[in-house]
Every structure is written in structure tokens, then in C-alpha cells.
Amino acid sequence: MRAQVRGGWWSLILAMVLANAPPAVDTASAHAALPVEPQVVRLATGGVGGTYRPIGNLIAQALSSHDASSCATAPDCPAGGVLVVSQTSNGSVANVEAMERGLVELALTQSNIADWAFRGTGRSQGRPPATSLRAIATLYQESLHLVTRADSGIRSVPDLRDRRVSLDEPGSGTLGDVRELLSAFGLSERDLKPEFVKPDLARARMREGKLDAFFIVAGAPMSVLQSAARSDAVTLVSIDGPAVDSLLARLPFYSRTVIPDGTYPGVPDTPTIAVGAQLLVRADLNDDLVYRLTRALWSDNTRAILDKGHAKGSQIRREHALDGISIPLHPGAERFYREQGMIR
């Protein structure tokens, strides 16, 4: 009897609780109402004063906004879409190392740095090949800038002997390029008074009379140099001649270019060398995701963001996407280019 009474009371209490409970919610509806976090993809860019950082910020913005708006209709889209987050870095070499360590999924890097790292050759000689690297696209050409004060007396690369020169930071692609250039001219770091700082700090040191020149590889125009040319007496040094001929014959991923008159206020046409800037991705990133990122990269939405966001953005064109790529394409990117008839 006691058991029956206890059971009766519990039944009564349960009935009262249910009577006062809020209406039942369909489980599927409840899950649908909850916000779904986007998949985060990290993009390594560059340092302050260069081109990688602003271009990387624009690409991250474009891929994220495009994916968020189109994800609902894509059957292979992860719930919540994709958020591409740009991160500053020391440059190409550091970006490749970050990809190898799994710290980022996407990275901007110079084509020669990508090639050397993937094969374990050149400046990556003696290191294990970076087999996790895959390519999405070549974006634009980067020019080697040799910047000096107009009154420095530096008119050519050999004039750098015994001068105070910044070669950019360790981890940058610029440092490797400058070492190759100096070697072509019969010089090395020991022949200079080298420093290793980014262009914004190099410019400040040059204004203070503590530095004679600095190198930077970046897409022209660079905002830090536009500002310097307007307010400081700076100029660019031509990089040309037989030494450059031998450099290009030995390392064909370099090419000749000219930084046009007017790119920087008061600076005339300046011959120099260039290398491709590429967007890389880890090999283990999902094929469908990389396909959608590649498709978004060449969308009208991204086109508008790049054209408005940076002077170099207008030079990022789909017809040049495969120029100079010497490491394997990611299967997701390859699928997109095959659909476009760019690969057979």
C-alpha cells in the first residue's frame, strides 16, 4: 500500500509539472535555431609596409563574405560557412614553415620560395621537402625594390659595398632573393653592413641617417614607399646588366620588369627583377572546400573587392592564375581550372 501511495504522489507531482511546463519544442527545430560556427581557415600574409598584408586582408574578406552568402546553396558546404582569417607574418619563408607545422591552412609566398621548399633545394637545401604544400593560384608579380636616399651616392648594386643596408627580416622571401642577387654581383652580406628589419622600420632608420639603403620584394606600389617618396628624398636603384642576365639564366623563376615612372612620386622608370606571388594551401585541406575557395577567389564579388581595395588588386587576374606554378595544384583547385578549360 505504501508503495502505491508513493507512486500516486509522484504521478500527481509529475502531472502538475507537465501542466505548467512550456510547450514542447521539436528537436530538429531547436537544433536549427542554434547558431552554427563557421569553419575557420587561417591565411598567413606578411609584415607591415609590404603588399602581402593588405592583399591578404582583402582575399580573406572576399572569400569569407562570398562563402557566407553562397554557402546555403552549396551541397558540399560545411555548416555555417567558412571564415578566412588573415594573420601577419615575417613573410614567405615563415609562411611555408607555418604551413608545414599546421599553424595555417593558406599562405602567400613567392614562387621561388615555394619551389625550393617543396623540393628541398635552393635556399631550402638540406631541409626535408615541404610535401604538404599545394598551389591554388599565382596572384601577381612582385618587384625587388632597392630603396636609398637620393643623396646616398648609391646608383647600382656594387655601390652597396661597405654601406648600411637592410636585407629584410629572417623568414622573409626578400632575404633569400637579396642573397641570390648579391651573389650574382660578386658580393655577399660580409661585404655590407647588413641589418635585418622590415621596410617601415628601415624607412625610419634611413630618415634618421642610420641606414643607407634597404631591400624589399613586394607588389608595386607599396604604401610605405609611396609615403616615403612624397615626404622624403628617396629613390630606387636600377637592378640590371650582365649580372642579372646570369641570375635569370641560373634561376628562371626570376624575370625582368620595370617599376614604371609615377608608381612612386618623383621616381622614374626603374629596371629590376620580379618573382610571382602565389596563394598556397595545405595538401590535407578538404578538396571540396578548396574548390569552393578557388571558385570564390575568381568570382565577381572578389574582383570588385580587389579592384577597390589595393592598386595591386587589379593585376590579380584569372588568366594568369597558372603562370609560374611549379609545385602541384591542390585537387580542389585543379577541379576548378579543369571546369574553366584552363587545364586539359
Predicted regions and their residues:
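Bacterial N-terminal signal peptides that target proteins for export
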Residues: 1-12
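Bacterial N-terminal signal peptides
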Residues: 10-23
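Immediate post-signal peptide segment of exported/extracytoplasmic ligand-binding proteins
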Residues: 27-43, 77, 154-164, 331, ...
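Bilobed "Venus flytrap"/periplasmic-binding protein-like clamshell domains
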Residues: 40-72, 141-208, 303, 323, ...
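Short beta-strand-to-loop elements that line the ligand-binding cleft
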Residues: 70-77, 82-90, 189-199, 216
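Pocket-lining segment of extracytoplasmic ligand-binding domains
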Residues: 111-113, 121-122, 152, 188-280, ...
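A structural signal for short loop-to-beta-strand junctions that line the ligand-binding cleft
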Residues: 126-139, 262-271
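An extracytoplasmic/periplasmic, membrane-proximal ligand-sensing/linker region
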Residues: 197, 201, 218-236, 252-253, ...
